[in-house]
UniProtKB/Swiss-Prot annotation:
Protein name as catalogued: Small ribosomal subunit protein uS5
Record lineage: Bacteria, Pseudomonadati, Pseudomonadota, Alphaproteobacteria, Hyphomicrobiales
Source organism of this protein record: Brucella anthropi (strain ATCC 49188 / DSM 6882 / CCUG 24695 / JCM 21032 / LMG 3331 / NBRC 15819 / NCTC 12168 / Alc 37) (Ochrobactrum anthropi)
Gene: rpsE
Role summary: With S4 and S12 plays an important role in translational accuracy. Located at the back of the 30S subunit body where it stabilizes the conformation of the head with respect to the body.
GO cellular component, one term: small ribosomal subunit
Keyword RNA-binding in record: yes
Amino acid sequence: MAQRERNREDRGREERDSEFVDKLVHINRVAKVVKGGRRFGFAALVVVGDQKGRVGFGHGKAREVPEAIRKATEAAKRDMIFVPLRSGRTLHHDVEGRHGAGKVLLRAAPAGKGIIAGGPMRAVFETLGVQDVVAKSLGSSNPYNMVRATFDALKHQMHPKDIAAQRGIKYSTLQARRHDVVGSEE
């Protein structure tokens, strides 16, 4: 009976997992020096998202690559953030993020521009569901720092309604000030 319950739970977990897309960003072989020599292991950096505005990243370490990837994927699913997207395809405004020596600049882009971003940032945007964005990495090219800096920038992304509420003005007034918005596009 316990086996049947476990199978049912696994099936439910698989259905929930199918809504997420995961991308392997980086695998690193690490060595631990012990008395008898070196013990090799692997560290994996994975980005997971639902392509609808939720995204997370995780880091996993294990003796085997598949186990490290599994651990990283589970860690990414546990620590996800929501990012408001404009028209479901791009960012609402330009934003900058930092982590350590890594610095990234993210800019909203017009429809059809595509994802113009390098390496680890591209994986974040693809799993997030962004279709049009221009991103530039300044500083460190370490994938861990780039991903964390990208997440720092995405955490500062705000919906115009939230910005209007924060400033104490009407949403329509804020939208009227935008030069690239015609009508009421969101």
